[in-house]
């Protein structure tokens, strides 16, 4: 893929993540976070190109969200680490079905911890409960919804986003 197409694809993924997060903002921010846009983190299984777009999309959404600079910093870092872990999982685990399930759990663990601690600090919420609530939202979106979504689009991914 040439440089222009890579930039456009990265921008499109960032815009899709940010827009999806902000359209359902009441569900996207808070101790229960059901960010439907988090389904997109599993696209990193297909190409590292998505790492930048997803991280940028999270940064944009958090800039416009209610949790301030802490979310811009820590939310973006959490997404970046999660997407990197998703990308590297099939490099370590060769069975594609197992790799998909394990990859889907990284955002649950990483965001649960980082965002849970951040929200607990910002809003004086109980730490363990807040970590659990954030992790639960991630698990529902990324594993329960995301895994079937990825299994559905997997045969079509080259047609949906050509030249990967």
Show which residues each predicted segment covers.
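Hydrophobic transmembrane alpha-helices
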Residues: 1-45, 49
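Small-polar-interrupted transmembrane alpha-helices in polytopic inner-membrane proteins
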Residues: 17, 54-62
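Membrane-embedded alpha-helical hairpins and interfacial helices in multi-pass inner-membrane proteins
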Residues: 26-31, 39, 60-74, 78-164
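Membrane-helix interface "capping/anchor" motifs
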Residues: 44-54, 94-99
